[in-house]
From Swiss-Prot:
Its main location: membrane. The keyword Transport applies. One of its GO terms (cellular component) is plasma membrane. One of its GO terms (molecular function) is proton-transporting ATP synthase activity, rotational mechanism. Belongs to the ATPase B chain family. This is ATP synthase subunit b. InterPro entries: ATP_synth_B-like_membr_sf, ATP_synth_b/b'su_bac/chlpt, ATP_synth_F0_bsu_bac, ATP_synthase_B_chain. The chain crosses the membrane at residues 7-27. The keyword Transferase does not apply. The lineage of its organism: Bacteria, Pseudomonadati, Pseudomonadota, Gammaproteobacteria, Alteromonadales. Pfam families: ATP-synt_B. It is a single-pass membrane protein. It comes from the Bacteria.
Length: 156
């Protein structure tokens, strides 16, 4: 019976040892393992969140860059249109100014022409009166008349 008493003693010691381990040793080990699992899970979740945030930030940056390029293209297009419009307006204004200057020149030439004609008429009238006086003062014969007309033509 010695084997039985030893076996029973070992069994009781083993049961006490298991109970002691389950009561005092096992809970801190399980707690440490669970904390480590939680830290690892939190780290993985944080990594996934960071990856998602990074992707989201990259998408936002891409969208903002696209919008900025679009706005820049619109600004450039508006500037080109505005520049073309200014050039066209200035060209039109230049043409109008040129037309005004040409018209003023034509008017000035026409006025000068009319003034010269009027002056010429006055001179012709004076010469005609002078010629008529000379004809009346002289005897009217054909030769004298021809001389006077030739002199008048020479004076003109």
């Amino acid at each position: 019976m010695n084997i039985n008493a030893t076996l029973i003693g070992q069994t009781i010691a083993f049961i006490v040892f298991v109970w002691f381990c389950m009561k005092f040793v096992w809970p801190p080990i399980i707690k440490a393992i669970e904390e480590r699992q939680k830290k690892i899970a939190d780290g993985l979740n944080a990594g996934e969140r960071a990856q998602k945030d990074l992707e989201k930030a990259q998408q936002e940056i891409a969208e903002q860059l696209k919008e900025a390029k679009q706005q820049a293209a619109e600004i450039i297009e508006q500037s080109k249109k505005r520049g073309a419009k200014i050039v066209e307006e200035e060209t039109q204004r230049g043409h109008e100014e040129r037309e005004k200057i040409v018209a003023a020149g034509h008017e000035e030439v026409a006025a000068e022409r009319n003034r010269v004609r009027e002056e010429l008429r006055k001179q012709v009238a004076v010469l005609a009166v002078s010629g008529a006086q000379k004809i009346i003062e002289r005897e009217i014969d054909k030769d004298a008349h021809s001389d006077i007309v030739e002199k008048l033509v020479a004076e003109l």
